[in-house]
Amino acid sequence: MTLDPYTAVGLIPEITEIRHRDDIATNLEHLHKLARTAVAMGGLDLPVKLLVLPEGSLQGFTDEIHDLDHATYARTCAIDIPGPETDELGSWAREFGVHIMAQAKARHPEFPDRYFNVGFVLDPSGDVILRHYKLTPLPPIEHSVSPHDVLDLWTQLHGRGPDAFWPVADTPIGRLGVMMANEASYPENARGLALNGCEIAYRTSFPLPGVASGAFEIQNRARALDNTMYVLAPNPAAYTGSDGLRADFFGGQSMIVNHVGHPLGRVNHGGIATFVTATIDLAALRRQRATSAWTNWTKDLRTELYQTLCEEPIYPANLYADRAPLHHAAYRQQVTEPQIELMRTRGIWR
């Protein structure tokens, strides 16, 4: 493994909403053109070894926006990993000589008519070397199944260890993990990655109003600082829906944050396709972890104390073990409102 610094490139694409799996080809064509320029320009100082595609780059957010039937989306829009789409991305990995981190709504062979939100990593040979199944989809609008929604069967298939929920790929360019989009709104997911060895975390995409409020940047920087790891957070530029409306629902603020919480590369604007770059210095990260007496916080976790916070369940496990994910209004009524009441009943909220 080389510890020489290298460049990471995050694409900031314009996304076209899909209505069928075949429509992904339109986004792939755009992404490839953007990647060619981004890798060429991004590598002028140091070689590009990591290429990052934001969540939604392949399929858009059709299910969230249109409150689609889950099983129908699984059959018509979700992909298989590996499959033709990841094969295409794999050809780019070989073309550019890079690792690629990306995302797709994808099926799982053990869960018919269901799809998960999957972050994945391709190595420079084009092989899929990591799949991360999103643990905390965006409530109440995202219909992706979480491993927690089918927890009993998931643990039968994958076990209960960190690799079942926060897998990390140990690669020549560092240990790569995924906490996409809303997952990073929960510090526990970043900590799960860090405790499984993650050094470089994929965190993208995030919508308005959470970007304009500052939440996106606060979370990115805090997760990096708390866990002494890089956070890669390119945000999409614009979105064209099936009705033809082109709009920026994301608000820019694409960034790559280093292991001490400083944004190294940043593009503030949205609206037009571009890219963000930064230097990844693994040697500096590992030195910080190995020599700091204070700010390598993870070494000081008093885990016996924190375990007491999790003895009582909060969000219900196995919510979709026997049914498809709920539509927006039903989710609000059957999940969101009871969860708020639970916090009050326990005396946590007033």
Give the positions of each predicted feature:
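Short beta-strand scaffold segments in enzyme catalytic cores
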Residues: 102-103, 117-121, 167-169, 254-256, ...
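CN hydrolase (nitrilase-like) catalytic-core segments centered on the catalytic cysteine
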Residues: 81-101, 175, 181-277, 349
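Active-site-proximal beta-strand elements of phosphoester/diester hydrolases
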Residues: 3-20, 24, 52, 175-183, ...
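Cys-nucleophile CN-hydrolase/nitrilase-fold catalytic domain and related Cys-dependent amidase chemistry
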Residues: 36-133, 140, 207-222, 226-227
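C-terminal beta-strand edge segments of enzyme domains
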Residues: 235-350
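Short catalytic helix/loop segments, enriched in acidic residues and glycine
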Residues: 25-38
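Conserved beta-strand and immediately adjacent loop positions that scaffold enzyme active sites
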Residues: 7, 116-118, 165, 235, ...
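Active-site catalytic loop in hydrolytic enzyme cores
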Residues: 108-199, 208-222
